[in-house]
């Protein structure tokens, strides 16, 4: 039996019943009880490090390169992220690439550089774990362990992520429904890790003008269905830098708890995803506009 994922408010409006009655009826059959707002009505707030929270009133700005390439590149990016008001540095040490001939990341050296950037600039770190073998190594450095879109339904990795004591950022799969996405989160929660955030990074559609299609409607819908924080990655969603800032602003307006933006000191020289990376000045310009939008929807940055 497949549950119909209709927000309680919409069910109530259609049926004329009370919200409490709807919750009671549906909580017993919701397929993802640990992730469900019907079972857990209060928003989850995840502490990444002292003073850095994901899911509270403050929208969390995250910036950094697709891949860690060198110490100079990462330190310049980390400094720009901190100066712009970002609280989290993203950067891939291990990169799952479509082509086996593409740059795959620096591996353990990339983790060392991320740890150096954290200590130097006071930023929290988000980076991806690609498999069970590398999960423990990544968790030693990351304040937020990313599970990428390709691994959203890697159930052995999800189970392992449930056993670590690090927050997890779970990206939506390329063709995943909201139910599949939330069920993937349920694997981590069921393993004992209560600190899970979701990341909308675009889905595959018939559109060819962008890399993916950013499903912004998923943000308010998932926040109705679930108590978990929701982050938006406008870089992978669009694949082209002129669209990143507008979609980041739209994400904040839609209620996202964080935005994850790819930036690079020299996007034209990036070893991966240069076309969707903002330059450091462009990132600063974007960051300056986000507080205005956040305040309009009752949030801060």
Q: Which sequence ranges carry the predicted segments?
A:
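Conserved anion-binding
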Residues: 93-97, 150-217
């Amino acid at each position: 039996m497949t549950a119909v994922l209709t927000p309680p408010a919409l069910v109530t409006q259609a049926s004329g019943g009370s919200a409490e009655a709807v919750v009671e009826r549906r909580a017993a059959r919701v397929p993802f009880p640990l992730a469900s707002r019907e079972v857990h009505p209060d928003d989850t707030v995840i502490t990444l490090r002292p003073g850095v929270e994901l899911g509270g009133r403050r929208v969390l700005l995250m910036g950094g390169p697709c891949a860690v390439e060198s110490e100079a590149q990462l330190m310049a990016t980390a400094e720009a992220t901190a100066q712009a008001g970002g609280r989290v540095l993203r950067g891939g040490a291990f990169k799952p690439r479509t082509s086996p001939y593409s740059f795959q990341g620096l591996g353990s050296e990339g983790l060392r550089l991320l740890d150096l950037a954290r200590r130097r600039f006071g930023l929290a770190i988000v980076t991806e774990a690609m498999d069970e073998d590398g999960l423990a190594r990544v968790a030693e450095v990351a304040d937020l362990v990313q599970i990428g879109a390709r691994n959203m339904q890697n159930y052995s990795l999800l189970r392992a992520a449930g056993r670590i004591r690090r927050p997890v950022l779970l990206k939506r799969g390329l063709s995943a429904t909201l139910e599949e996405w939330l069920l993937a989160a349920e694997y981590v929660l069921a393993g004992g890790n209560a600190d899970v955030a979701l990341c909308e990074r675009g889905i595959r559609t018939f559109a060819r003008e962008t890399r993916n299609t950013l499903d912004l409607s998923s943000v308010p819908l998932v926040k109705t269905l679930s108590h978990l924080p929701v982050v938006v990655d406008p870089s992978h969603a669009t694949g082209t830098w002129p669209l990143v800032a507008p979609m980041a602003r739209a994400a904040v307006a839609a209620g996202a708890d964080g935005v994850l933006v790819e930036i690079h000191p020299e996007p034209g020289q990036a070893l991966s995803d240069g076309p969707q990376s903002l330059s450091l000045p462009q990132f600063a310009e974007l960051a300056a506009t986000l507080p205005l939008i956040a305040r309009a929807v009752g949030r801060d940055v």
